[in-house]
Amino acid sequence: MATINQLVRKPRKRPVAKSDVPALQSCPQKRGVCTRVYTTTPKKPNSALRKVCRVRLTNGYEVASYIGGEGHNLQEHSVVLIRGGRVKDLPGVRYHTVRGALDTSGVQNRRQGRSKYGTKRPKS
């Protein structure tokens, strides 16, 4: 425990919170260009082929971004919007691609949770 005199000389330091998504630079989303679109396998105990793209952002950062939903239309040079949010079973993937924005299409035949996948309301 510090004495009053010590605290007068040198006040307590507040801990600095480290950002989980440094490439966004405090923005909600960032635009970027796909440099590589590929699939990768998750950590144990999961098994799948997860769709991921490498994105060069407008601020110069290059990050890996997860492509959620069933099927996608992304290829090299596609312009995408990314948001924060990591994928727990893919090491190094700390961003998500926003579906239905810029060159990314929404998920086809999606009925529930449509807003998360950029799908329009189906004609009843």
From Swiss-Prot:
Part of the 30S ribosomal subunit. Contacts proteins S8 and S17. May interact with IF1 in the 30S initiation complex. PANTHER family: 30S RIBOSOMAL PROTEIN S12 FAMILY MEMBER. Signal peptide: none annotated. This is Small ribosomal subunit protein uS12. Keywords: Methylation, Ribonucleoprotein, Ribosomal protein, RNA-binding, rRNA-binding, tRNA-binding. PROSITE patterns: RIBOSOMAL_S12 (PS00055). Gene3D superfamilies: Nucleic acid-binding proteins. The modification 3-methylthioaspartic acid is found at residue 89. Belongs to the universal ribosomal protein uS12 family. GO terms for molecular function: rRNA binding; structural constituent of ribosome; tRNA binding. Residues 111-124 have a biased composition (Basic residues). InterPro entries: NA-bd_OB-fold, Ribosomal_uS12, Ribosomal_uS12_bac. It comes from the Bacteria. One of its GO terms (cellular component) is small ribosomal subunit. The keyword RNA-binding applies.
